[in-house]
Amino acid sequence: MTPNKEDYLKCIYEIGIDLHKITNKEIAARMQVSPPAVTEMIKRMKSENLILKDKECGYLLTDLGLKLVSELYRKHRLIEVFLVHHLDYTSDQIHEEAEVLEHTVSDLFVERLEKLLGFPKTCPHGGTIPAKGELLVEINNLPLADIKEAGAYRLTRVHDSFDILHYLDKHSLHIGDPLQVKQFDGFSNTFTILSNEEDLQVNMDIAKQLYVEKID
């Protein structure tokens, strides 16, 4: 499988998490390619039983497609752990590096890397690392955007976005840190959270990319 096709698989998977319907237009926008290029790739992927057309959802990954996506995330996140713990990369540096390496390392390399790292369960951004042969099921899956009540929470996962990671680093907010959800303003569509004795106004776009758990 080519790196380009693997990127399409991940793109379709991620759109399916964010949106109800996966369209050629959305794929083209995220992949930064032309609509005809998307149409051609979609044809190939359908012929290889990686995706199928769905009236309501646009496209769905097949079991084979989901298996391949899970393996890509497994490689990517194990590489991120290695970069942070053994090569002193920072959390906002590792994503782009792992994006390149995930397409080049062998299955044997990944198995030995996982053993070297002590079989980690999550990446530095809090994303779940699926075991070999298992589908990806995120452990930390409650977005801040879905929080309905004020209270004490803990940051458990963030999207692999440079802008988000830079924003969190600027405010010294890291995976595992406690935070207080003080209120939600429906008019401005923002959350007020307290972190490190600082009130932060978090808009809905950011809140969708931060995952938390309630602290009892």
Regions found by a protein language model. Give the residues of each.
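Mid-protein regulatory/catalytic core that forms ligand/cofactor-binding pockets
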Residues: 102-209
